[in-house]
Structure formats: C-alpha cells, structure tokens
Amino acid sequence: MFGAGKPNVVLIYIDDLGYGDLASYGCKDIPTPHIDRLAKEGVRCTSSYITNPPCCPSRCSMLMGQYGQKFGKYGMSRGLSLPEDRPTLAQFLHGEGYVTGHIGKWDIGSRSQGPLQTGFSRAARTPPKKQYTKRELLRLSPSLRRKLEEKNGKSKYYCVNEDGKTMWLTDYDGDAMVEFVKDHKHERFFLYWSPEAVHSFNTEVPEHLMARTKAKGMRRYLAGAISSVDDQVGKLLDALESSALREKTLIVFSSDNGANGGEGGSSAPYSGGKGKGTQKEGWVRVPTIFSMPGSLPKGVTHEGLIANFDFYATIAGLVGTPAPPHCDGVNLLPFLRGEKKGSAHDYLFWLNNEPGDAVRRHLIAVRWKKWRLYRKYQKDRWQLFDLAADPHEENDVADKHPEIVTRLAERHGAWVKTLTPLREISKETSPAQRVTTGHGWETARKKRTPSGG
C-alpha cells in the first residue's frame, strides 16, 4: 500500500488555530491555499478533538498517544514530567530507525525533558528574538508598544538569523523544515513542527501578510499570522516534491486547541474557544488533515470521532509496527481510507480538573454521536446538547433525554476509574534541558528507548 520502505512523517501542530480559521473548513476571509491543498490531496477530519486542552497538556497527550489523565495530567500543570516507563511517539519512531526532528515551540514535560531527552535526535535551536530600540518602539502603535515594553523591548515574532538579519519567526521555522528535509531525504524521517504561531499576541504581523486577507479589525493580525503558517506549508510541499518524497510522506496537520476569540479567532460553526469560551465545543474541536497522495484518498471528509492521541497509533500503523500497549489511540488508516465506516471511538471523555485556574479550565464532558454531555464542576447538574441541531449549545435538552444523560454519565464514571490520580509537579534542581537559544541544530546523545508497557 505504501510502496517500498517505511514512509516519512511530518506532524504540524499549530498553536490556537480555530476550527473556523481555514478556508478548507469554511473560512471566507483568510486564504490558505497550501493548507487547502493538503485537504484536497488528503482527508479532512471534521470531528477531531483535544481531550486535554490547552497547549501544554494537549502536546503531552499527543506525544504520548494517550489521555493525559492516564499519566496524572488533568490541566495545564506546566512542568509535570512525562512518564518515562513508556515511549513517546518520537522514541517509538527512533526505535524504528527514523531520524526524528523537532522545530519550534516545545512546552512538553518537565524542565529536564526537552526534545533531545524524549526521543528527538535533532532539535532546531530557537533563534534569538529581535530587540527593539527605543526609537523603533516609538514608531509603533501605543498598544503594541506597551506589550513589547512589558517584555523589555524583546519581540515575540521577529528573530535574528545566522547572518544577523531580522526575520519573521514563522519564516525562519519554514526554512528549517526545508533544511531538515534536504538533509535527510535519503533516510526515513519524522519531523515535528510546532510553531509559536498563531498564539497571541499577533499585532507585530507585517502589513504584507495581512493585506492578502479580507479580515477586518483585530482579526487582521491573526489572519496575517495564519497566512505565514500557510506559506511554510507551501515551502514544505515544494521541498518534498523536489526531493521526490511527497508520495512517500504522511503530513498530519492539526492544532493544539481551539480558537482564541480575543485575537479574533473563529470556531465557526461552533461556539467557544480559548479565554471565555473554554466550556464549549469550540475549545476542543480542531481542524485536522491527513495527507499522503497515493496512499490516502484525495478530497475526502471523515466525520467520525477522532482525538489527537490517535496520531501515535495511526503513525505506528503506517510504519507497520503495533503501537505500544499504553496507547489509547486507534489506527485511523482504515477509517481514512474508507475501509471502515463510522467512528474510531464510540465515546470521547474530558476531565480537566485544573488546580491553577478552575474558573476557566475545569471541564467535564462526553462526546457520543451527535451528543455532548457537559458540566463544569462535579457538583453541577449535567447539561446535554444536540450539536447537529444546536452547534452553539444554546438549548440544554437534558430533561428531554434523561436516558442519554444516564448512559453517558455512566460511561464517564467508568472511564474515570481507569485514570491515574493527579500528580504533583516535582521541584527540579537540574539544569534545564529544553530547546536552547541560538542557530542551527542540537543532536541527541544515544540513549536507551523505553519499551513501553
């Protein structure tokens, strides 16, 4: 099915990209031709979920291939270590003979668990950020100037390259992706790109990026940032094609959580998202595309329930090796190819007991078919929403369907019994081993890969 040898894998994980922020998902004001091409040359998933938002827990769950609650991560808990008795996706692929590369944002595990300690053989250093002069700051809008002054004049999205020239950070990442592909075109590789884009604040975005879009108001800045992400997907596709690797490479494109409404992000046709909307569908439903011409169908939509922890099992299926037993994910390939109908999961569950930010991030929920059962705290009554008829979740129908409430609540209770208790973040005294600032790449020392269990 996949030709001679094991395929390459590129996993792109955008920060705060909303379900309604891509043209292939119905967005009308932000052209994303290269990402749209992934969808045209692959499978667009319309019920793809993050079961442990936001950024940090989402990434940890994805890299481990299981519910974060299975290893004691129930909310942000930034700095909580990844379990070391089971392999990460990168460790699994490294054990299969892959060169494993990381570019961009990390935000995973403890301070001593950087990319090189968790299975990546190469990690791109983070370029130094531009330092604005006082004169440059005075030329900026008052709102942007205030944000930058809070960071002592250090830019969020402009960096300085090897030649001392100022670059847009997302462009810099795209060049690193091209470099990685060219360096390893004769090897099996796994590349994980997780840009800082399109995380707030986006008000540094240059006008030429915003001018491509039809977005208005605050959304123009976000739109420009999304346009830059799309440019890098185009660079990647060109690099793969010039190396005759496009049909030998699976590209998985997704987001770590839903849209940031404060930046003008859209979860349409659903409600909710980052900030004030973390109790609704838009916070956890994200765009996800699987693209591999010749191996997956083109221009297909998959409506079944999937989760970000399915990426691990799906990639393992592509490689031809069973996923480790700790994985909660399902190999999606038979569903993406139309060999199996329906959903890979009958149910998906949420239990985000966020110790540090209960007001925004407590979330208890179940998804089943068209239904979403929800409550914020254990003491609250269950609410039930028919997402097909009521995507904005405005009409609680729990009283009309008590049998469904009972069914889903019982399923949730049974799932909770399989979880690991909330773990505390240990105080580490060891030096940080995360991505370092500089140019070029860091390379991992050889280390035994966990066998799982």
Q: Which positions does each model-derived feature cover?
A:
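Formylglycine-dependent sulfatase
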Residues: 1-382, 389-417, 421-427, 435-453
